[in-house]
Amino acid sequence: MAEPDNFDTRDRQHIPIDVFRETAAYTFPSRNQERKPLRGDYAAHAAHLLDQLAVALGDVPLPADDPRLAVQGLKSGTIVEITTLPPAEDSRTKAVKVPTALEFPTQDVVVLRSERNDDRTESALLFVPDDARAFLQGRISEYGRDPGNQRRPDVERFEVVEEVRAIDTGSLFTGAVDLTAPDIVWWELWVRQPVALADRLVNAARSANIDVHDDRLIFPDTTVLFLHGAAATVALFATRVPGAITEIRRATGTIEPFLDRGETGRGQHDWVAELSQRVSAPAQDSPVVCTLDTGVAAAHPLIAPGLRGAWAYDAAWGSDDHQPNGGHGTPLAGLVLYGDLEPLMNDARPVTLTHGAESMKLLPPHGFPPTKPPSYGVVTQGAVSAVEIERPGALRSFCIATSATDFPPSRPSTWSGALDQIIAGAMPGEVDDKVAAAERPKRLMVVATGNVSGGMAVDVLPSQPLEDPSQSWNALTIGGFTRKEQPPAPPPVLQAAVPANHRSPFSRGSQSLPDDLTPIKPEVLFEAGNMMSDATGFCGWDPSVSLLSAGSDVTGEPLIPFWATSAAVGMAGNFVGRLQAARPDIWPETHRALIVDSARWPEPIRKKFIGTGAHWKTGKAATKAKKQAMLREFGYGVPDIDRAILSARNDATLVAQAEIQPFAIGADGRTGVFNEMHFYDLPWPKTALEQLENEIITMKVTLSYFIEPNLTGKAATRPDTYRSFGLRFDMKKRTETSARFRSRISASQAKDGTEADGETSCWLLGPKAIQAGSLHCDLWRGRAIDLAGHDAIAVYPVGGWWKSHVGQKRVADKARYALVISISAPGQKVDLYSEITTLVDAKEIEVLLG
């Protein structure tokens, strides 16, 4: 019997395509090595560098006058700062990078830290041991000599170096520091590995009467110690152990959830009583969403049915919600369980909770001292471990709605790095040489971008930079949009700060961050409420354009307004819980990919990307850079729970989950090399696409995996030193043969002598636009008949510290990823789904029969 014309109805499971995966050897394709010389006179440049180096290094102090401490395993040496030359004014180069090859590891000449400058140069702190001075000077001298017909030695090391200079006492500090300030505060000291060096520095610091906390964070290349003292004291200690410390940061201490309240909220007891009678508790084995916040009012009639546990990082704090004016953890948990309560209050239907909530108090109540050290990386890892000990085995995700304002998001922090470890299953004690990374449990975590407070519209409405730790690569970062614009009645002299279906004025983004060094954040948007603006242009929160949730004052004010990205994270937690309840069988990486795949831009935002006809907007207002910037403000849109869970006949989603070994030990037994890639000859609905001919169709590809972070001073300018491994995807071109596609991706694949015709790219970003992050998403928009030829995709590795840091013995480790591909023809009476599943069934039979 023929199916009814319900082409848009979502009633079909997503389509697994793992049976189409083929593993192949991967070799990085060779590139044209021809390059233009950057120096007109190399001898003069070498002489210039030698002169500057001599001044920067100074004389080696006599033993009797040497202030440096003798630390076992640490060579005595000096730190100098090098800066690259700027690119040409007309160059499209993002920056002239500090060369990776600048280091001589066998001599312990190493880059401690690097950073991007506003003039598109980069600077680095270079440690030069005393016994390596002559070696380094000799290499620079050789670089300056005429090589004759040979290649100039070390040109890749020294050619771009413009300046070498001595450092000052504050050079190791990240950000501005007042060395005269008497305040005794906590500092992060980033210490080079091995861990034994950090242990020796602890002893040295304590011998100098500096307070060092026992807690620490451990990353592959760095151990983070926490010292308590004045800036000058810490700086003096650092100058006495040059080469041991890569950088010094003020320990995170300003956690600022959006907690302002204002006028009394509008909760009423009869509303709560009526709704609570309609609520059915979730099953005991249902997924849970754990909020890491200010605690929870466990007795609240709307919280109690779904609450599966409430604890505190420090038991002395108690698990109740200590935040005044209605709490913060309680309304967050309310949104996690129910979403916005306003539509439920205006309804009469039963409410069945699909998932539970847990609360772990992460922040100390008023009157309690701050945690020591004030490192929310340490605290968050401890909190997550405690929850999992209390209720082991639960399918669980985590929500963080708090942020810190005192650290720039352009580089990883100890908090964002700690989140990346949590999510990847790589906290201290979790990494086991006998267990592949792919087999360790992973965690899904949603994190707020941080908030923009009220103020004048001219200051509030332009998107502001992210707050720490939302730059985390592995976390799903949540921004805000709003559908709320109704002013309070009777009409005052107020109007909504932004129209409905725009980015919420509370939300932050990453468009001001370097797109070659940082991930696209936020990835998605959820309802965050709006601001109201008065006649002077002043914007601020208002209950009429906020969400409604449970309040911590159960007897006095059980319902309160809740807003900003804290509310958006609560809504995201609700979405995650519902998705995990519907699909408990898939990985956290896959849940994250499906959330992003399901997202669509509201119409006013969509018009910023899409022009008339088949293509994306073009022109000066829609360059690749402008599109990247818009993504960094709006993400990939607002997720749709039905789309995330189910496909339709004209909107099919294909899903793959796979393990991959990105690297292996090379033939020399000493270096890491690329190992394997995956090809998918996709079950492509060519017949249906060709029948649609020139109709507009959209394809979305999302690749999701979790990296293990390596927090080093170089991570800010070298994404490949921060990630353990990286993956990318590329799709077969419309006119490309399968053999040509394979050889284009990997040098190890045989070439067929053909070239793809020049074709207009229909991708929003294109395969070369992604440099950082662990979730990569791109959209293809064009004619259906053109999409018919894009019937294969490759997933291949890019570098990471597993490959470059052979001494860590992780080269041959296995990773895993989720790949989601959706093809959407909304409004079209076309059955993409059935054609795809027919091909999948045929392939499965073929494999079964051998």
Show where each model-derived region lies.
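Substrate-binding/access-modulating region of protease and related hydrolase catalytic domains
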Residues: 196, 363-472, 485, 556-563, ...
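Catalytic-core environment of secreted peptidases
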Residues: 294-318, 481-496, 501-569
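Short glycine-/aliphatic-rich beta-strand segments at the starts of folded cytosolic domains
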Residues: 58-91, 174-193
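Subtilisin-like serine protease catalytic core
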Residues: 277-311, 318-375, 393-398, 407-410, ...
